[in-house]
Structures are given as C-alpha cells and as structure tokens.
A protein has these predicted regions:
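A short, well-ordered alpha-helix in the C-terminal region of glycosyltransferases
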Residues: 141-155
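C-terminal alpha-helical cap of glycosyltransferases
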Residues: 154-179
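Short alpha-helical segment that forms part of, or immediately flanks, the ligand-binding pocket
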Residues: 61, 79-87, 107
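Acidic donor-binding loop of glycosyltransferase active sites
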Residues: 65-79, 87-88
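Donor-nucleotide binding loops and adjacent catalytic segments primarily
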Residues: 1-70, 103-107, 111, 118-127
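Short glycine-/small-residue-rich Rossmann-like dinucleotide-binding loops
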Residues: 33, 74-76, 93
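C-terminal "capping" alpha-helix adjacent to the active site of nucleotide-linked donor transferases
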Residues: 116-119, 123-140
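Short hydrophobic beta-strand element within catalytic cores of glycosyltransferases
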Residues: 72, 88-99
C-alpha cells in the first residue's frame, strides 16, 4: 500500500524493542512490499516473534476480525472496516494523501476513542514501541477502544447513500420539470 515501506522499517523494530515477555505474546500479521519481505521476516525471526508476512492477504476481513490491535493507514475503507468489526487501531495517515483526507478519516475513530492517531512524522521506533507496551499491559484500553470503534460503525451506509442520491435526483428532476 501507499507508504508501506515506512511500516516495514518501523513496526518490526518497534516490536523488537518491546520487553521479551511482551514479545512472546505477539502474533503478527504484516502486509509488506515485496522488496521488504526478507528484511521484515529476518527481524521477526531474530526476535522470535511469531509472524506471518505477505505482499497481500486475500482473507483480510477474517484477519481484522481476529486481531486484538491493528496498525494501519487510514483510508476510508480501512476505517469503515475497523469500525464494522470493532477493532482498536493505531492509525497512521498517509502524509501525502490528497487534502490530508486520511487524517480526517482517522479522526472519526480517534475522536470517539476507538483509535490512536499517530501522524507519520511521529512514527518512529521509540514512540510506537512505547505505545504498544502501554496497550499490551492495559487490556482495558484495547477493550474500551474496540467498543468505541464499533460504536462508529454505520452498517446501513450504502443504503443511506443510495436513498440520499435518489432524493437528490428526484428533487433535481422535479426542479427541471417546474422550469
């Protein structure tokens, strides 16, 4: 995905920086660019972190549903999926997204307490590792964030959008008929 190289550089190192007793609890699924796979796998292997890495996962909905925490970009689809499955997340908006729309997407969940927004400029090993250690030692934070994320879900969004479009179209058509 866009900017995934930064994730490949920071996330494995941040997990490596965790205390050994925390690292032993990890089961990581990380999507990487093809050119980053070997380096990422090597770090996880050296740290004895159980990890599955690939350039693409076909079963992402199931993986999201099984996750205790997701670290991701904050595209609209990702944010919607996280809300629907009620998963807490650390969202790192893509710094070069048009009109910084990913920051606004992330704020939908972070303002509700369902995610932690981490600007890309602040994404580094000590910051991420410290945040993850805090979350791993306070499971209530993850549980509360999961509930908050799910509270932002809009399961009928497609139907509501279709209804709005039809309403607007009907108004436009009746306006043309009157003219």
């Amino acid at each position: 995905s866009q900017g995934a190289r930064r994730f490949s550089e920071v996330i494995p190192q941040a997990l490596l920086a965790l205390a050994p007793e925390l690292r032993r609890r990890l089961s990581v699924v990380q999507q990487c660019r093809a050119e980053d796979l070997d380096a990422v796998r090597q770090i996880y292997g050296q740290a004895n972190i159980q990890a599955e890495t690939a350039t693409f996962f076909t079963d992402m909905p199931a993986r999201l549903a099984a996750a205790h925490l997701v670290i991701a970009r904050s595209g609209a689809g990702t944010v919607s999926e996280l809300a629907m499955v009620g998963r807490p997340s650390v969202l790192v908006p893509y710094a070069y997204a048009t009109d910084d729309h990913q920051s606004r997407n992330a704020e939908v969940l972070s303002s509700a307490g369902g995610a932690w927004l981490l600007p890309e400029a602040e994404l580094d090993v000590p910051v991420l590792s410290g945040h993850l250690a805090k979350l791993m030692t306070d499971p209530d934070m993850l549980r509360d964030a999961a509930k908050a994320a799910h509270g932002r879900a809009q399961p009928n969004a497609a139907a509501q959008l279709a209804e709005l479009v039809l309403t607007l179209a009907a108004g436009e058509l009746s306006g043309r008929a009157a003219a």
